[in-house]
C-alpha cells in the first residue's frame, strides 16, 4: 500500500494552492499520510489535513512527546539514541529516518534553504522511493526518482547547503547500518 511522507521546511508556514491540490489528490485516493510534528510545513500540513477531516494520518515524533498534533491523530514516538538528550538536528532527524523507511513515496515542501528537507529527499532516494519536491520560492514541483534526478536537484542548492548536507549525510551513515549509496553526494 502506498504511504506518503509529507514534510518540509520549518520556514514554510502556509500551503500554496498548488500544494493543497496535491494533498487533495492524496486525500481523494485515501492514501495514508506520515507527517512530522515540527512547526512550519509539518504543522501547516497537519492543519490542512484537519480542515479536510482526513483520518488516515500518523504523526511521528522524536522522543517521548509530540510538539504538534493538530488533528488528534495516532502518534508514533520514535525512540532516540541514549545519547540523544539534546534536542538538536540529530534528535529530530530520528523521526524523519523512520518516516522515510516506512513511506513508499514522499512530498517535500522546500524553501531552498532547509538542510532537513534535502536530507529527507536523500533518505527517500537512497531507498529507491520517488519524491516530489515543491520548491516554494519558484512555485514549482520537481520529481526526484533516480540518482541523475538527485544530482540535478542538488545542483539547485547553494554550495554551503551542499556542504551541510554532505556533512549530515556522513554523520548519519556512520550512525546507521551502512548505506551503499554514499556516491549520491
Where are these regions (language model features)?
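Extreme N-terminal starter segment of soluble prokaryotic enzymes
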Residues: 1-4
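Acidic/glycine-enriched connector segments
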Residues: 11-177
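Glycine-rich beta-strand-to-loop/alpha-helix junction loops that act as flexible
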Residues: 7-9
Amino acid at each position: 500500500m502506498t504511504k506518503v511522507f509529507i514534510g518540509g521546511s520549518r520556514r514554510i508556514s502556509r500551503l500554496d494552492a498548488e500544494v493543497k491540490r496535491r494533498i487533495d489528490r492524496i486525500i481523494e485516493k485515501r492514501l495514508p499520510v506520515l507527517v512530522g510534528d515540527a512547526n512550519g510545513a509539518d504543522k501547516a500540513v497537519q492543519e490542512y489535513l484537519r480542515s479536510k477531516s482526513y483520518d488516515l494520518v500518523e504523526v511521528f515524533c522524536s522522543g517521548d512527546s509530540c510538539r504538534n498534533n493538530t488533528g488528534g491523530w495516532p502518534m508514533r514516538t520514535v525512540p532516540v539514541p541514549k545519547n540523544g538528550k539534546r534536542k538538536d538536528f540529530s534528535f529530530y532527524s530520528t523521526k524523519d529516518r523512520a518516516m522515510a523507511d516506512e513511506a513508499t513515496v514522499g512530498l517535500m515542501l522546500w524553501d531552498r534553504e532547509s538542510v532537513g528537507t534535502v536530507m529527507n529527499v536523500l533518505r527517500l532516494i537512497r531507498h529507491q522511493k520517488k519524491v516530489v519536491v515543491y520548491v516554494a520560492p519558484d512555485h514549482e514541483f520537481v520529481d526526484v526518482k533516480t540518482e541523475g534526478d538527485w544530482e540535478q536537484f542538488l545542483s539547485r542548492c547553494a554550495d554551503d547547503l551542499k556542504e551541510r548536507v554532505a556533512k549530515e549525510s556522513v554523520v548519519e551513515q556512520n550512525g546507521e547500518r551502512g548505506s551503499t549509496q554514499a556516491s549520491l553526494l
